[in-house]
UniProtKB/Swiss-Prot annotation:
The gene is arnB. The lineage of its organism: Bacteria, Pseudomonadati, Pseudomonadota, Gammaproteobacteria, Aeromonadales. It comes from Aeromonas salmonicida (strain A449). Belongs to the DegT/DnrJ/EryC1 family. ArnB subfamily. Pathway: Nucleotide-sugar biosynthesis; UDP-4-deoxy-4-formamido-beta-L-arabinose biosynthesis; UDP-4-deoxy-4-formamido-beta-L-arabinose from UDP-alpha-D-glucuronate: step 2/3; Bacterial outer membrane biogenesis; lipopolysaccharide biosynthesis. This is UDP-4-amino-4-deoxy-L-arabinose--oxoglutarate aminotransferase. CDD domains: AHBA_syn.
Length: 378
């Protein structure tokens, strides 16, 4: 019996373990020098002007929406084909999520789909870079500038992704995730990057109780022990334990993403004869980070549905994922927006299946997955 092959596994090595031990022995384990170093390294690597480390991308989205003043009566345009946290945050702030459909084959939205949804109440647009590929950003930014609407890029899948001639995050405002399955992980964590200093300053306050400085700043700068609360805030800071892991992962990322690309090339070659439909690759210039490798399982072509395929793979010791069930099909949002129709989103939501992909996989692992798929489908 072969070992179970998960759909994802973090690439943690001796360097990450040593970095954590170093922090544990340092006497400073919460937000401190490593967190600050991570922010600087992120800016140096991707050309960002400001970077704010947080304990999750969800936290980053929360404080960014708050910093932009999003609240009751406001509308935020975003795909339903995304992780539900963004929709939850818009809703919890009292604003209205305005769901935009996506391209049927890339799962990404576009300026053409967004434009008809803009109203006088639109206060933000949140496009999603999907599975490691970049959304076609320039037309969306041009549209947003016409209406003076902020754009927040959901870059949870896009660390190490390039769009045309630049890294995702090099300009504008974007939020990255360091969750356990992401290309760069520190178990839990995130990073807001922006070229808007005022926004970065607000996010820094909101992420740490509304104080103008964090605990390490107060110690190293000799500030008064009790800092001033500028505005009510949260506790969303990233610890140095997490940041130490992220620093090693950031240095390793080109190598890790290259491994992903090699595995995907094998998948693409071996799956060519099967009736599964991988996502389409964007035609504009880009560098794909290959966060996820996804196929669509169409019952008419495959002879079984997505859930049956996932179960059959599970029985053969192979894990899969679902990224994602569309947010508007979840119970709360389904009942709140019963008349909403997003044809491309809904078609994909019922057919998407994420196959195993992580840097420590081997080509033999890919061949095993393809052999299982061939056995199931034939």
């Amino acid at each position: 019996m072969q070992d179970f092959l998960p759909f994802s596994k973090p690439a943690i090595g001796d360097a990450e373990i040593s970095a954590v031990c170093e922090v544990l022995k340092s006497g400073w384990i919460t937000t401190g020098p490593k967190s600050h170093e991570l922010e600087q390294q992120f800016c140096d690597t991707y050309g960002c002007q400001h970077a704010v480390a947080l304990n999750s991308a969800t936290a980053g989205m929360h404080v960014t929406l708050m910093a932009l003043g999003i609240g009751p009566g406001d509308e935020v345009i975003t795909p339903s084909q995304t992780w539900v946290s963004t929709i939850n945050l818009i809703t919890l702030l009292g604003a209205e999520p305005v769901f935009v459909d996506v391209d049927r084959d890339t799962l990404m939205t576009s300026a053409e789909l967004i434009a008809p949804l803009i109203t006088v109440n639109t206060k933000a647009i949140i496009p999603v870079h999907y599975a490691g590929a970049p959304v076609d950003l320039d037309p969306i930014l041009k549209l947003a500038r016409q209406y003076d609407i902020p754009v927040i890029e959901d870059a949870a899948h896009a660390i190490g992704t390039r769009y045309r001639d630049r890294w995702i995050g090099a300009t504008g405002t974007a939020i990255f995730s360091f969750h356990a399955i992401k290309n760069l992980t520190c178990a839990e964590g995130g990073m807001l990057v922006t070229d808007d200093k005022a926004l970065a300053d607000k996010v820094r306050m909101l992420k740490f109780h509304g104080l103008g400085v964090d605990a390490f700043d107060r110690m190293t700068l000799g500030s008064k022990p009790q800092a001033e609360v500028i505005t009510p805030g949260f506790k969303y800071n990233l610890t140095d334990i997490n940041a130490a892991i992220a620093l090693i992962q950031l240095a390793r990322l080109p190598e890790l993403n290259a491994r992903r690309a090699g595995l995907v090339a094998r998948y693409q070659e071996k799956l060519a004869g099967l009736p599964l439909a991988p996502l389409a690759i964007p035609t504009y210039p880009h560098l794909h980070a290959w966060h996820l490798f996804m196929v669509r399982v169409d019952p008419e072509r495959c002879g079984l549905d997505r859930d049956q395929l996932m179960q059959a793979l599970q029985e053969r010791g192979i894990g899969t994922g679902l990224h994602f069930r569309a947010a508007h099909t979840q119970k709360y949002y389904r009942e709140r927006y019963p008349a909403l129709s997003l044809p491309h989103t809904e078609w994909n939501s019922s057919r998407l299946c994420t196959l195993p992909l992580f840097p420590d996989m081997t080509l033999a692992d890919v061949d095993r997955v393809v052999a299982a798929l061939t056995d199931i489908l034939e």
